[in-house]
From Swiss-Prot:
UniProt keyword list: Endonuclease, Hydrolase, Nuclease, RNA-binding, tRNA processing
GO molecular function: 3'-tRNA processing endoribonuclease activity; ribonuclease P activity; tRNA binding
Quaternary assembly: Consists of a catalytic RNA component (M1 or rnpB) and a protein subunit.
Domain of life: Bacteria
BP GO terms, sorted: tRNA 5'-leader removal
Main EC class the enzyme belongs to: hydrolase
Catalytic activity, reaction form: Endonucleolytic cleavage of RNA, removing 5'-extranucleotides from tRNA precursor
Organism the protein comes from: Bacillus cereus (strain G9842)
Protein name per the record: Ribonuclease P protein component
EC number, as in UniProt: 3.1.26.5
PROSITE patterns referenced in this protein's UniProt entry, alphabetically: RIBONUCLEASE_P
Length: 115
């Protein structure tokens, strides 16, 4: 993901947690905060240490980033998202991760995601 599509700072994460709305399925929780003045969407990823060792956590983050890269044209701009991975995603394949992210994005009200 390009730098303009990332959330890195703790206060930006906290703003999305406190002011945003959340949607979830069994694998992911997605917090969403509207930022109309922002030209792009931004994504922050969080994978807890409860999920596995560093290898497993980094694998999950790589799969989520790749799915976001493939879906970037369909994700609404002007929004911040924080994606939190849950334990079941540790055993998922890339296709399952992508399908699960599409499902949770649709639940959050995104109309443009069609896959």
């Amino acid at each position: 993901m390009k730098k303009k599509h990332r959330i890195k700072k703790n206060d930006e994460f906290q703003a999305v947690f406190q002011k945003g709305k959340s949607n979830a399925n069994r694998q992911f929780v997605v917090y969403q905060l509207d930022k109309e003045e922002q030209p792009n969407f931004r994504i922050g990823l969080s994978v807890s240490k409860k999920i596995g060792n560093a290898v497993v956590r980094n694998r999950i983050k790589r799969m989520v980033r790749q799915a976001i890269t493939e879906l970037k044209d369909e994700i609404d701009s002007g929004k911040d998202f924080v994606i939190i991975a849950r334990k079941p995603c540790a055993e998922m394949t890339y296709e399952e991760v992508k399908k699960s992210l599409i499902h949770v994005f649709k639940r959050s009200g995104m109309k443009r995601i069609k896959k």
